[in-house]
Curated annotation (Swiss-Prot):
Native source organism of the sequence: Azoarcus sp. (strain BH72)
Catalytic activity line of the entry: cytidine(34) in tRNA(Ile2) + L-lysine + ATP = lysidine(34) in tRNA(Ile2) + AMP + diphosphate + H(+)
Gene: tilS
Entry-linked SUPFAM superfamilies: Adenine nucleotide alpha hydrolases-like, MesJ substrate recognition domain-like, PheT/TilS domain
Cellular component terms per the entry's GO annotation: cytoplasm
UniProt GO BP: tRNA modification
Entry-linked Pfam families: ATP_bind_3, TilS, TilS_C
Keyword Zinc-finger attributed: no
EC number: 6.3.4.19
Lineage, opening ranks: Bacteria, Pseudomonadati, Pseudomonadota, Betaproteobacteria, Rhodocyclales
Protein name, per record: tRNA(Ile)-lysidine synthase
């Protein structure tokens, strides 16, 4: 029995290129699925050479929660493994419901762990439940594709491995019994007030009576849907390139069929690690982009969809407070959730200023500046318009002030009287917004 599960389990590890440099962390609830996962990881560790730890998330929702944490601690101690116990408080006022809120808190704890891969005990029956749950919720292709056995990490978060995803729960229990393993039973798994439990105990048995192979069939359907979702991602990449990159040329974007435009914005949203917008919100955003010339800043899930001067892009809010700084020679200064970098350089791209002379602060009313010899002095509004900086970002632009005069404005440039001459050394300022890859791309060169 051990060999039967070790073979497919090892295939998933090989597919993820797991080796001696890999740091794996097993998500250990104490249930049979996670206990079997930990056992197989322990058996396969000498073959693959990976570093193995475990984590238990203590929700505090059950009177047995402390006992479960102690069980997991004993299990890991017997195997010489380090166990991290993460205690979380599950909010009850989020509107998500207890089941979803607990899952969200658990996920937030797990993805913050210092490892390369999180390893879960999800199995084929879990996959079937997930497909049905998301079908009834009205998910799209990516959601209906459910879980993948190998899910590479994104946004500096660890990847996810599910080596038992093609194994049914019955096979996992049989393995555990044959191997003499012990596990705990979570009484909440029998509570059909929770949607997934209702699917497991009430819906799937009825379907299985008519279609005995429902679990592997739904797993196969999920794999096909993931392939379709991957193809839509490829199409989004092609459409983004045709539109000129992450900051889209508005005229080219407007020429896309509505379904492809929506697909592109969904893909960009996912790439930024944000919550997917609702179908209705996405449709309304596309309608306004088509009908209004801009400037526009429209809510889109966790992000904002912006349109200005013939460009369309997604950005996050930077709500961090702006604090004035006296520059005393530091290589960088914080600015909101971003920063201003200051490096040594020369020529017209450098600023003639000494440490202790410049104050980093927001724009002030009546700000005017001349960008180069022979050029007129322009108002702050005119400078922003010429640089393509939209109205909602202007109050948060960083300005270096010297003796009450604006010497440099982030995204715009250096005032003529503070520019270094050819061969003269000075300081080169560069503004890096909160999310330079998304929020700041429409500003062009940050080092202006």
């Amino acid at each position: 029995m051990a060999v039967e599960l070790a073979g497919p389990f090892a295939e998933v590890l090989r597919a993820a290129a797991i080796g001696p440099a890999s740091r794996l962390c097993c998500a250990l609830s104490g249930g049979v699925d996670s206990v079997v996962t930990l056992d197989l990881l322990t058996r396969l560790q000498p073959r693959f050479g990976f570093t193995l730890t475990a984590v238990h998330v203590h929700h505090g929702l059950s009177p047995h929660a402390d006992a479960w944490a102690q069980f997991c601690a004993r299990l890991c101690a017997a195997r010489g493994l380090t166990l991290a116990i993460r205690r979380v408080e599950v909010p009850t006022d989020t509107g998500q419901g207890l089941e979803s809120a607990a899952r969200a808190r658990r996920h937030a704890e797990l993805v913050a762990l210092p490892c390369d891969w999180l390893v879960f005990g999800h199995h084929q029956d879990d996959q079937a439940e997930t497909v049905l749950f998301r079908l009834f919720r009205g998910s799209g292709l990516r959601g209906l594709g459910a879980m993948a056995a190998v899910e590479p990490g994104q946004h500096a978060m660890p990847g996810k491995l599910r080596p038992l995803l093609d194994i049914g729960r019955a096979g996992i229990v049989a393995y555990a019994r044959a191997a003499g393993l012990e596990w705990i039973e979570d009484e909440s798994n029998a509570d059909c007030r929770f949607t997934r439990n209702a699917l497991r105990h009430k819906v799937l048995p009825v379907v299985q009576a008519q279609f005995p192979a429902v679990a592997p069939t739904l797993a196969r359907t999920a794999a096909l849907l993931r392939e379709g979702a991957d193809l839509l991602d490829d199409l989004a990449r092609l459409d983004e390139n045709a539109c000129g990159g992450p900051v889209l040329a508005a005229d080219v974007f407007a020429s896309l069929p509505a379904a492809r435009a929506a697909n592109l914005l969904r893909w960009q949203t996912a790439r930024m690690g944000a919550r997917a917008p609702s179908r209705a919100r996405l449709g309304e955003t596309l309608r306004q982009l088509r009908e209004a010339p801009g400037p526009l800043r429209l809510p889109l899930g966790d992000l904002w969809c912006c349109a200005y001067q013939g460009r369309v892009w997604l950005e996050r809010d930077d709500e961090a407070p702006l604090r004035a700084h006296l520059w005393c020679g530091e290589s960088s200064l914080g600015w909101g959730a971003g920063q201003v970098r200051l490096s040594q350089g020369g020529g017209g791209a450098a600023l003639r200023v000494a440490a202790g002379e410049a104050m980093l602060a927001p724009p002030a009313p009546g700000l005017r500046m001349r960008l180069g010899p022979g050029r007129p002095t322009r108002s702050f509004k005119n400078l922003c318009q010429e640089a393509g900086i939209p109205p909602w970002l202007r109050p948060r632009l960083p300005v270096l002030w010297v003796a009450g005069e604006p010497a440099w404005i982030g995204g715009i440039g250096i005032a003529a009287q503070f520019q270094c001459a050819e061969g003269e050394q000075g300081v080169v300022p560069a503004w890096v917004p909160a999310s330079a890859a998304q929020q700041g791309q429409h500003l062009g060169q940050f080092d202006r």
